[in-house]
């Protein structure tokens, strides 16, 4: 059996909370066209991401990448921000 690695997902969003130590909450929005009503719908989701240096604050735009589980809810890591 061969070990084939899947590419890790990369998402972009905005930090909405940085109160926890080494953790930020990132809100990721996506738009898609509804298949029946043909209207664009905006959907958002929140992810807990690991920020090892505590350098991102609320309002920062960041990119997060999927990683191994760090805790019960954290499976994403902040890779860079603006």
UniProtKB/Swiss-Prot annotation:
Organism: Rickettsia rickettsii (strain Iowa)
InterPro entries: NA-bd_OB-fold, Ribosomal_uS17, Ribosomal_uS17_bact/chlr, Ribosomal_uS17_CS
Homology family: Belongs to the universal ribosomal protein uS17 family.
Any GO BP annotation: translation
UniProt keywords, alphabetically: Ribonucleoprotein, Ribosomal protein, RNA-binding, rRNA-binding
GO annotations of cellular component type: cytosolic small ribosomal subunit
Lineage, highest ranks first: Bacteria, Pseudomonadati, Pseudomonadota, Alphaproteobacteria, Rickettsiales
GO MF annotation: an example: rRNA binding
Keyword Ribonucleoprotein among record annotations: yes
Encoding gene, per UniProt annotation: rpsQ
Top-rank taxon, per record: Bacteria
Gene3D superfamilies assigned: Nucleic acid-binding proteins
One Pfam family of this chain: Ribosomal_S17
Protein name, entry field: Small ribosomal subunit protein uS17
Quaternary structure note: Part of the 30S ribosomal subunit.
Disulphides: none
Protein task: One of the primary rRNA binding proteins, it binds specifically to the 5'-end of 16S ribosomal RNA.
């Amino acid at each position: 059996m061969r070990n084939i690695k899947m590419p890790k997902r990369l998402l972009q969003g905005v930090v909405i909370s940085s109160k926890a130590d080494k953790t930020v909450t990132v809100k990721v929005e996506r738009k898609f066209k509804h298949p029946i009503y043909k209207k664009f719908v905006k959907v958002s989701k929140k992810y807990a991401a690991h920020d090892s240096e505590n350098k991102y604050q609320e309002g920062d735009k960041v990119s997060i990448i999927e990683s191994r589980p760090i805790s019960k809810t954290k499976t994403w890591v902040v890779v860079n921000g603006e």
